[in-house]
Amino acid sequence: MEKENIYGNWSPEVIKQFKKWQLRTILVTMVGYAIYYFVRKNFSLAMPGLTAQYGISNTDFGIVIGIGSLVYGFSRFVNGFVVDRHSARAVMAIGLVLCALSNFAFGFGYNISAWLVGADPMATQATPDLINMLVLVMALTIVLNQAFQGVGYPPCARLLPCWIHPSELATKMSVWNTSHSIGAAAAVVACGYIMGSMGQDLSHNPDVINTIAANLKLDPATADGMKQILQYARHWDAWKWCFWLPAGLAILGAVWLFVGLRDDPRSVGLPELPDTKTGKSDTEKDTRATRSAFLRVMVWTNRWIWTLCIANVFVYVMRMGILDWGPKFLTEARGMSIEDAAWAVAAFEIFAIIGTLAAGWATDHIFRGKAHRMCLVCMVGASLFMSLFIFLPGLPMVVSIFVLAMAGFFIYGPQALIGIASANQATKEASATANGLAGIFGYVGSFLSAIGVGIVADHWGWNVVFYLIIGIGVLGAITFITMWAAPRDGYARSQNFYANLKK
């Protein structure tokens, strides 16, 4: 469809107003969703500080992250139904307020834990009972936060198709998708700065030095050991500000969303977009049985949907393995400061933005809309650069960061394209169900990444973690190979379904 025909017989003034609101909706939701990441990915930068002060293990962190991932996936699936029945604008804003409250609670988690066990919250040495209570409080607040995080995406999935014509949706959604990486990159840089500049300077306290040395298993007699110890001793309790400051930003973000968004064109006196109804004839209505049969054909028995779901597990294990655990690995195994580790993960996300846009362009212009073929290229590229990163540890830091960033360039292509491929294979009438199913599989991958990385890192070390991540990338590539012959979309399958229904 040519661009000038997208708006049918609308007047120039109506088109101008519609485009203004379309751009406004895209920008407001991009900023709002990026702020959701500030109160989600801050935990990754706080983890090294929590380990240094309280000796919390990678296994404990992994269990918390893993359970949170499952809660997030379930919440996102359920809230898709909630948003269909309520104001997407209000739901998205309220979700961000609730995330802010859970982050404020996490920042006060140590004080709450001390009160519950009757300990002194000002003490620099925590008792085992206090640490156990802290882990429990931490788990509860993270799980609550992940439940509220699941409110963030469904409103966007409902709002954007109301304002963007189907012929432009893939291109503009790929641009919108960069909000994930923009938010994550900004969050890790901001929290990296917080961890390296805020908190109390207790480097003069020998008890603090000994506590950190014991928790991180470092020798204060060595220069490298003391350097790492001091970076935490000089910024004691900085981790708390990684939750309080983003929480304040989230409150402002909620106001931004509520003021800036409208649910659909009709709410501002504009007409609905032409050609945004379902693919079947306007007079045709599905019965419950027909709808159930359609979903069975297009989703539940569609081999390509299930292949994409399985592939999404591998994609999320790779992506979240780096995003959730990158700061800890880089500080503990590569000896980086928290600030440098934050910039490394930020570079990973910045390159991911470029990779997402490049993958979308290549899908349309090289692979003629067959997103699964571009996903194969991306998984091979991500596995290759992860191999270079782990097997060449002696590279200069700048080169190492570049290699890690190139892994981000490739891994975010499938993360964005699987949603588009699922929608195409299921057709727009079943795209929400297909994406919900793929999303659940993705966060099963997050759960496996969280639990697996924590346990493996504690028992066999960080190198083994990355060997496994590379292996996961290879399995993902093999999965996409099995889709090479798949069609671009499922519309022929859908037409065949309705043709058979009329016989």
Residue ranges and their predicted role:
Residues 7-19, 267-307, 498-503:
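Juxtamembrane intracellular "pre-TM" segments in multi-pass secondary transporters
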Residues 41, 69-77, 184-185, 349-357, ...:
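Residue-level signature of mid-helix packing/kink "hotspots" within the transmembrane helices
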Residues 43-47, 302-357, 415, 449-450:
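Extracytoplasmic gate region of multi-pass secondary transporters
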Residues 85-96, 365-379:
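Cytoplasmic membrane-interface "Motif A"-like loop-to-helix N-cap segments
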Residues 97-130, 380-394:
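C-terminal ends and interior cores of transmembrane alpha-helices
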Residues 141-180:
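Cytoplasmic helix-loop-helix junction between adjacent transmembrane helices
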Residues 171-199, 352, 439-449:
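Glycine-rich segments within core transmembrane alpha-helices of 12-TM secondary carriers
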Residues 369-418:
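C-terminal transmembrane helical hairpin of 12-TM major facilitator-type secondary transporters
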